[in-house]
Amino acid sequence: MQDFIRIHEDDNVAVALRPIAPGENLTVGQYQVTVGEEIPQGHKFALKPIAKGEEVIKYGFRIGYAKEDVAAGGWVHVHNLKTALGDLLEYQYEPVASG
């Protein structure tokens, strides 16, 4: 089983597919990451240092901005991520029919 997933090649975060312990070394594409803190399953961690105010990229798109500096291997969550969704938090799910 894979330990993480990087959804898009432009992402600067990956998602833990299991709890990841501090000190674990992971290779994510071209990034060598030593995890700095407990990363809960389903949560994001930085693949490279992300400076305060820098965009956080997931799915190949900006999902928010770092509220503080985040080290490579650091947990990226509500405590250090400001959403880029704006004040409007409504959306309509419209699945695309396949084939």
Spans of model-derived segments:
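N-terminal small-residue-enriched
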Residues: M1-G99
